[in-house]
Amino acid sequence: MADQVQDVHPMEWGPGKTPQGRARLPSSFDATVKDPVAAVHSENLVCRVPMHRIRHLESLVYDLMQNSSANVNQEQVGVTPSPGDQPHVPDYPTPSAAHAPSTNQEPASAAVSPADYGSMQSTGGGANYVGSAHWAAVLDGIAELKDHLDNEESHHSDSQGVDPPCLQVTGPQLLYGCPKPADKDEILSSIPARSVVDRLVSRYFNSFEMSPAVLHSVQFLKEYEEFWEDPQTTSPIWLGLLFTIMCLATQFEKSRLDPGVQSPAVLSMERELQEMVDTFRLRIPQCLVLGSYAKGGPFVLETLMLYIAAEIFLSNDAEIEIWILMGNTVQLALHMGYHRDPKHFKGLSPFTAEMRRRIWATIVEMDLGLSAQMGLPRMIKHWQTDTQEPSNFQDSDFDSATVEMPPSRLNTDLTPILYRLVKARLMTTIGYIWDFSADVRPYPYTEVQKMDDKLDQARKSIPECLKWHSMARNITDSPQHIMQKVILETVFYRAKIVLHRKYMFLPLAQSASSRRIVLESALKLLDYQHMLQEETQPFCQLYQERWRVSSLVNHDFLLATSILCYYLQHARGATPQLSESASFDETIMTSLSRSHDIWLQSSNSSKEARKVVRALAVILGRVNTPSADAAGESGLVFGLQSTYPPSTTNDYSQAPMITPTAEWQEMDGQSQWLPGPRVIQRLTYDMQRQQMRWGL
């Protein structure tokens, strides 16, 4: 019996083998053949294999696996797993407590299919793996899509040509070393005049809800004044922090430009802002390297966190380099002891302790979000940390001189930090679910039910001021507040899908419940995608906040789209008896059709959108419609132009230090870079009207 249970999981796999160790089917031929002659022979061989026979063989194998899984599940009934086979699913907050199902419960494991092992894609540089809960793995598990996606991707790669090796470095420059090391004088010379920096700092604090979780506004303003009094004595790391703030603020400013207006003045302003972004972006790693960031110290984590945020907003798709940079940040945080609560250590002031808790909570959240986007296990485990959650304070409630912290405000008090606190609590529960889904061992369905209850409880605990009801009931809220509510909803429904996905087609009574939860959650996510697409149009409520629909947010919509495609494939083919009603399937088709049109708009600037468009074209029967490559040159994302085209976003080697529209001026004996007049005019604002919201 034990041997039968162990067979559920892969013991070995590699080139030429399936996750079960068997020889691959013809449709799984490795596309990366080193010998050119062999490559031609392999291509001809694949072309000679009838695709209908491949699909038939795959269907037979899948049916055998389903039957085998059903037999294993029936034999497991009434048997308590051995300690070595039990999943490590802790009950909050005790990390070491494992739930052993009683003998009168049904410890049914999830059905095993090839997609349950994740997806491995061969590339020119190696192999890319994503877990089974990732949207790409879900699509790769649909047999009918394999030849379409592979052929289309190959065609797109051929049309793009071969990139010259080592001419450009994309992604976070910090991972590759600085191509242009700079000293402090050179770095200081690229800081704009104070009038411009003031406006950028204000834009950052008034636009970015992550700011109170990373920086204390009162303390930062003190350091900011000290910098202008004597720039030469400022540490390189703090300068890097300032550049991350300016880089983010300039991105926010650029996103406010109307993509529908292509006048010379607007185009000129867009170029100036992009040049500013490129300059600031290049200076950040230069400052970090100059300040020996790997040793840790003040402002290192804050700078790295905002640097990662800037890279996320500059990326149209998930980028492995950002996840790796997040790993470096986690390692530095562990090295600096942020994973242990400050109460264990004497000498830390109340102010320092509270800020360390804020920063650690944000790092945990970023780690989970980026790991989920990459389809990989998260780096921080719950049993590694005992740092308490931060309190609900206004920045005016405490400062560096505080001797004893005041009582935390109630959750009904909508402070700038409250959204981060509420999201951190929700992400704690979602983190358990992500660990749960990433566990390679089988686990009983009773554990899924327990985790589902935990997730529902976490959602119910969201304060009323941050709960989503409908767009009609949010018309008096600020756009930022609306987006916060939407994000809390999308991460909740994504977690529902991740938790129940493996049980969608399990041949047991519980599968119907899990299948319905997954499908309804996916439809909910696509409803939010459609709503955001409409509300981010010109003159709509979220138009100025459309930059918030980042690749992290789109990941949830990609998962929802893929899971609905996966369901339709089963409903039409392998397991039609497990399909829902015809009217429900029609609702899914309608939702996918709208989603297809949305993804099509961004398919020129996003390879992820391009892949899902091709998948939807097959599922919806639009194979003969214009492909993603012919979607037009608009590069639209939710009805707006892609803010940072791939051709200029990731090219550090071309980042301009001096631009035709920039001006130079002497200030305090130093040359300072001053943006063009259009940018200065754009950044002009009423300081008192946009006074910082942090209790000043």
UniProtKB/Swiss-Prot annotation:
Protein name: Equisetin cluster transcription factor eqxF
InterPro entries: Sec_Metabolite_Reg, Transcription_factor_dom_fun
UniProt-listed Pfam families: Fungal_trans
Subcellular location: Nucleus
GO molecular-function terms, A-Z: DNA binding; zinc ion binding
Name of the gene: eqxF
Residue ranges that the Swiss-Prot or TrEMBL entry lists as coiled coil: none
Ranges for region Disordered: 1-24, 73-117
UniProt function note: Transcription factor that regulates the expression of the gene cluster that mediates the biosynthesis of Equisetin.
Residue pairs linked by disulfide bridges in the UniProt entry: none
